[in-house]
Amino acid sequence: QPPTPPEHRFPGLM
């Protein structure tokens, strides 16, 4: 699986 961007790993961060 491709590395997921931080904004996808931590919803609400952006």
Swiss-Prot record:
Entry superkingdom = Eukaryota
* One cellular component (GO) term of this entry: extracellular region
Q: In which tissues is it expressed?
A: Expressed by the venom gland.
The listed locations are:
Secreted
Keywords (alphabetical) are: Amidation, Secreted
Q: Which organism is it from?
A: Polistes lanio
- Identify this protein by name: Tachykinin-like peptide-I
Q: Which residues carry this modification: Methionine amide?
A: M14
